[in-house]
Curated annotation (Swiss-Prot):
Name by which UniProt lists this protein: Cytochrome c homolog
Any one Gene Ontology molecular-function term assigned to this protein's record: heme binding
Family according to the record: Belongs to the cytochrome c family.
Segments crossing the lipid bilayer: 9-29
Gene it is expressed from: cycM
Binding site for heme c: C84, C87, H88, M150
Organism of derivation: Rickettsia conorii (strain ATCC VR-613 / Malish 7)
Pfam families given in the database record: Cytochrom_C (PF00034)
C-alpha cells in the first residue's frame, strides 16, 4: 500500500465522519427536539424520622439531667455503651484504643490520661467529666468540642444518654 492510497482512506474516513456530524446538526435544527426533563420512576415522600425529631427536640428544649438520672437504667446503658467499646476500653488502666479508656471517667479531669494524645479541641476544654458535660458530649461530640477526633455522631435520646452515664458510674467502679 502506497502513501497516496493511505491518504485517500484516511480522507474518506474523515469526510464520512464530517458528513455524519453535519446530518446530525441539520436534523436537530429541523426537528428542534424538546428538552423537557421528565422524571423517571417514582419519588418517595420522606418524613422526618423520630430520631431526627428527638435530636432537634434535645437541642431546642432544656433537659433536666438530674430528673433523667433518677430514672436511668444501667442495664440499658450497658447495651447502648457497646458502641463505645469499639474505640474505648472499660478496664482499669486499660489500653487506649482509638479513644482513651473510660475507667472511672465520671469525675475525672478532661483530657487527663497521660499516655493518650487528645485532640487540641478536647485538651483545651478543662474541667471534669460531670453529668452535664458527659451529657452534652455524648449527645453530640462535634458540637461540645468542635474539632474533636471522636467521629461518633452522638446519642439522640436523652434517656439513653442518662442510661450510659449511669452505666459508666456504676459498672466501672464495681469491676
Amino acid at each position: 500500500m502506497s502513501g497516496k492510497e493511505l491518504n485517500k482512506i484516511v480522507a474518506a474516513i474523515l469526510f464520512a465522519s464530517l458528513i455524519a456530524m453535519m446530518v446530525g446538526f441539520v436534523a436537530n435544527i429541523l426537528y428542534k427536539p424538546t428538552l423537557e426533563l421528565q422524571h423517571r420512576g417514582y419519588s418517595v415522600a420522606v418524613q422526618e424520622s423520630s430520631e431526627n425529631q428527638n435530636t432537634t427536640a434535645l437541642e431546642q428544649a432544656p433537659v433536666n439531667i438530674p430528673e433523667l438520672m433518677k430514672t436511668a437504667n444501667a442495664d440499658n446503658g450497658r447495651e447502648i455503651a457497646k458502641k463505645c467499646l469499639m474505640c474505648h476500653s472499660l478496664d482499669k488502666d486499660g489500653p487506649n484504643k482509638l479513644g482513651p479508656h473510660l475507667w472511672d471517667v465520671t469525675g475525672r479531669p478532661k483530657a487527663s490520661i497521660a499516655d493518650y494524645k487528645y485532640s487540641p479541641a478536647l485538651s483545651k476544654l478543662g474541667g471534669v467529666w460531670d453529668d452535664d458535660s458527659l451529657f452534652a458530649f455524648l449527645h453530640k461530640p462535634s458540637s461540645y468540642a468542635p474539632g474533636t477526633k471522636m467521629s461518633f455522631a452522638g446519642i439522640s435520646k436523652p434517656q439513653d444518654i442518662a442510661d450510659v452515664i449511669l452505666f459508666l458510674k456504676t459498672y466501672v467502679h464495681d469491676k
